[in-house]
């Protein structure tokens, strides 16, 4: 435990802690070196006061990569910007071997200014024309919620006279299995898996404009059984996409 934290606990007789707080070593070192400064900052800016240590993202990314290494896995890690809006953290993340996903036009502008090159950015979420236009102009990967978004992206690409294919994922929803129960609220984003024939037909019809990266899905449920079914369904469609000659590059299991 940090010496400064220990002193505060000992001075406050009303504080009864059964367990010491778990403090990151970087944070602990800062507290030990600057115990008075912390109180000065609270006096100046008020409470609650959030102090950010951007360099901690390096440790987190390294921990993720270690999981890949231990399990002989390959893949690309994505930092998600929606719940992590600190520009300083995004800038630090850009110095690591990670990509990033965004869910709005404003967020896309932000991550571009933080040092992420377009090939490291993926656009998710509902996309109006302004958001979609910026994504197409910058050449970032588009994670489409529906075929309408893809059609609009193609039209924007052609109107701008762009020759390079658009990198796209197609987000799936509506997963099903006889052994697991799903509700209509589960997996509300994406194209229903029952519409797979329409997806394949669209992708093949627009193969000159779209570079199909693969399928994606977002799953917020804590149910391990549902997550397994979602992965199974997505892998089945990935295999079918290969048979259809679409050459998917991977599977996005995060968004």
Label the predicted regions.
Residues 1-158, 162-166, 207, 243:
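A charged N-terminal "starter" segment
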Residues 79-81, 102, 125, 144-146, ...:
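A cross-domain feature marking catalytic cores of carbohydrate-active enzymes
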Residues 2-5, 11, 175-255:
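Active-site loop/helix belt of alpha/beta enzymes
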């Amino acid at each position: 435990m940090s010496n400064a934290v220990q002193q505060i606990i000992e001075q406050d007789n009303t504080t009864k802690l059964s367990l010491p707080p778990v403090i990151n070593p970087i944070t602990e070192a800062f507290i030990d070196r600057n115990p008075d400064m912390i109180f000065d900052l609270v006096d100046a800016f008020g409470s609650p006061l959030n102090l950010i240590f951007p360099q901690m993202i390096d440790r987190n990314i390294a921990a993720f990569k270690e999981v890949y290494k231990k399990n002989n896995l390959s893949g690309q890690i994505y930092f998600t910007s929606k719940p992590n809006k600190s520009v300083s953290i995004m800038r630090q993340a850009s110095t690591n071997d990670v990509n990033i996903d965004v869910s709005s036009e404003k967020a896309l502008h932000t991550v571009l200014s933080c040092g992420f090159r377009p090939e490291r950015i993926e656009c998710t979420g509902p996309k109006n024309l302004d958001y979609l236009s910026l994504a197409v102009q910058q050449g970032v990967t588009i994670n489409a919620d529906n075929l309408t978004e893809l059609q609009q992206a193609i039209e924007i690409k052609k109107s701008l006279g762009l020759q390079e294919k658009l990198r796209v994922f197609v987000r799936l929803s509506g997963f099903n299995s006889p052994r697991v129960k799903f509700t209509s609220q589960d997996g509300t984003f994406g194209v229903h898996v029952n519409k797979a024939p329409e997806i394949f037909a669209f992708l093949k019809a627009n193969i000159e404009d779209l570079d199909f990266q693969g399928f994606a899905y977002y799953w917020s449920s804590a149910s391990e059984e549902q997550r397994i079914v979602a992965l199974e369904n997505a892998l089945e469609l990935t295999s079918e996409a290969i048979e259809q000659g679409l050459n998917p590059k991977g599977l996005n299991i995060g968004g």
